[in-house]
Amino acid sequence: METTSTERTAGRRRDPQTDAAAIEAVLDLVSAGATLSGLSLVTIAEHVGVSRNTLYRRWKTKEELYLDVLNAVNRPLPEFGSPTPREDLAAYLAILIERTLDRRAGSVLRALQAEAQAFPELHRRYFDEIIAPRRETVYRILRRGIAAGEIRPGIDIEFVGELLVAPILARMASGAIEKLDPETTGHRIVEHVYRGIQA
């Protein structure tokens, strides 16, 4: 089970319901048009219906809360172990699409991307703690594909990993992600990429 940034802070008594309500509040407010820069812990506390000190006891800064929000929308991945790495790649992409189809999750992810320069430390931790481990999952699947003889040895697995997710990120940026069917699109992307990397 992953430990969030705030759970590592000693001495804080946590109320899971309040924590969940604060995360939901950020998702609601950002999806309604609020910016990450414009929000404050005071505003979020008012939306939840608790005192600001209640939130300050949990998160010293809104950036800490935002990291917990990002952890919440990026749920842990399942174990990938199908007989063919190709199927695992398609399943991974389907999960990524399902996440971005969530309107509120998509709003927060786009907001973070738009305000990355305003929150460099948050953006760095999001990459290090959430994105990088997921990329490594893709790399492991690709290595399995090479070992199984599905994929041609010598490919640049980091570049191929970027090729796999690029169509999804492009659709998310343009607001056209809702037109995608997760399972069908995941398989289509993998089939197209495999034409260039299969053994």
Positions of PLM-derived features:
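Hydrophobic/aromatic-rich alpha-helical bundle segments in the mid-to-C-terminal region
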Residues: T3, R124, D128, A132, ...
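Amphipathic alpha-helical packing segments from all-alpha helical-bundle domains
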Residues: D102, S107, A111, E121-A147, ...
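Short amphipathic alpha-helical segment with a characteristic S/N-K-E followed by hydrophobic residues
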Residues: A22, T61-Y66, P76, L89, ...
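Hydrophobic alpha-helical connector segments
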Residues: L77-R110
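Helix-loop "lid/cap" segments that line or gate small-molecule binding pockets
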Residues: A94-L101, L109-A118, E191-I197
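Short hydrophobic/aromatic patch on the recognition helix
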Residues: V48-W59
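Basic, helix-initiating cap at the start of DNA-binding domains
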Residues: M1-H47, E64
